[in-house]
Amino acid sequence: MSNVNLSVSDFWRVMMRVCWLVRQDSRHQRIRLPHLEAVVIGRGPETKITDKKCSRQQVQLKAECNKGYVKVKQVGVNPTSIDSVVIGKDQEVKLQPGQVLHMVNELYPYIVEFEEEAKNPGLETHRKRKRSGNSDSIERDAAQEAEAGTGLEPGSNSGQCSVPLKKGKDAPIKKESLGHWSQGLKISMQDPKMQVYKDEQVVVIKDKYPKARYHWLVLPWTSISSLKAVAREHLELLKHMHTVGEKVIVDFAGSSKLRFRLGYHAIPSMSHVHLHVISQDFDSPCLKNKKHWNSFNTEYFLESQAVIEMVQEAGRVTVRDGMPELLKLPLRCHECQQLLPSIPQLKEHLRKHWTQ
């Protein structure tokens, strides 16, 4: 009889997929999107958006939990966009893990994440993935840069932004649950085909959407959700990440005369701290808009050494308010400071500096 009871208990435990809308700058708690239920959000206390250009009913969201995407309908007058492409009034498009939804006018970035929940009838629902009480530590592993895949081979001018990678060196890997398929970053980290280097502390992969001829991501095996979650205990890890970044430059671009920068985005596009190692040519078809450019050429990009010094001196990283506004600044050449009106003209201008 006891064996039957155990079997029944196991039988009634079922897994349910749930969807969450997550503000990338962690200004408020994530919002649950019930399966196939229309949820309308916009300006208000739930989102903490006070911008009058954002309607109180800006978007309608309907989660297709079984299919792994959310249908987004723009209800408000001002533009809502997904990956910088405007949806259009009364139009509906799919928002998938790895894409960024800007609520209005390229502001207020959101992503969606899916979780598996174990649920017992009559009992409290238990999440398969744990999260702390700190909203900054909510995992958001779906992001454009972090999708399973790789970047351009160095020097390629192809219109493609994704080609196979060389296999990384063998090293022990700290096992971690990959969770839902949308967590492309963790999958990429664990996949030998995606790796160019790994050791006990970090792994290096090519950015799937490189913004330059050489663009790598250095990621710690330890899960750190954002720069705000970095503490003094991570100091040696940050130093090691910087050292590995420099090593990758020597190993894979040693003959190149290109200049490199190592740094972090003030507000990361995924919930796993990652160091960008990027050449300063910005010669890539994946560099498509002002947001891409300014994320690497304004104070939005925090130098690796500066981050290390902050943690060394203060025990934490200070990210000032208003960072998203930097992404809207005019296009300015990082070499000569000349203002350019468009990305195509900026790219043409940059060619002059390649020959110098």
Swiss-Prot record:
GO terms for biological process: regulation of protein stability; single strand break repair. Residues 1-110 are annotated as: Interactions with ADPRT/PARP1 and NCL. One of its GO terms (cellular component) is nucleolus. Its EC number is 3.6.1.71, 3.6.1.72. It is found in: Nucleus, Nucleoplasm; Nucleus, Nucleolus. A motif (Histidine triad motif) lies at residues 272-276. Residues 207-211, 269-270 are annotated as: Interaction with DNA substrate. It comes from the Eukaryota. The modification Phosphoserine is found at S132, S137. A motif (Nuclear localization signal) lies at residues 126-131. Residues 182-287 form the HIT domain. The record marks S188, H265, H276, K291 as: Interaction with DNA substrate. Keywords: Cytoplasm, Disease variant, DNA damage, DNA repair, DNA-binding, Hydrolase, Metal-binding, Neurodegeneration, Nucleus, Phosphoprotein, Zinc, Zinc-finger. Signal peptide: none annotated. Residues 38-87 form the FHA-like domain. Changing K52A: Impairs interaction with MDC1 and localization at sites of DNA double-strand breaks. The active site is at H274 (tele-amp-histidine intermediate). Widely expressed; detected in liver, kidney and lymph node (at protein level). Isoform 1 is highly expressed in the cerebral cortex and cerebellum, compared to isoform 2 (at protein level). Widely expressed; detected throughout the brain, in liver, kidney, skeletal muscle, fibroblasts, lymphocytes and pancreas. GO terms for molecular function: chromatin binding; damaged DNA binding; DNA 5'-adenosine monophosphate hydrolase activity; DNA-3'-diphospho-5'-guanosine diphosphatase; double-stranded DNA binding; double-stranded RNA binding; mismatched DNA binding; phosphoglycolate phosphatase activity. The histidine triad, also called HIT motif, forms part of the binding loop for the alpha-phosphate of purine mononucleotide. Interacts with single-strand break repair proteins XRCC1, XRCC4, ADPRT/PARP1 and p53/TP53. Interacts with NCL. Interacts (via FHA-like domain) with MDC1 (phosphorylated). DNA-binding protein involved in single-strand DNA break repair, double-strand DNA break repair and base excision repair. Resolves abortive DNA ligation intermediates formed either at base excision sites, or when DNA ligases attempt to repair non-ligatable breaks induced by reactive oxygen species. Catalyzes the release of adenylate groups covalently linked to 5'-phosphate termini, resulting in the production of 5'-phosphate termini that can be efficiently rejoined. It is linked to Ataxia-oculomotor apraxia syndrome: An autosomal recessive syndrome characterized by early-onset cerebellar ataxia, oculomotor apraxia, early areflexia and late peripheral neuropathy. This is Aprataxin.
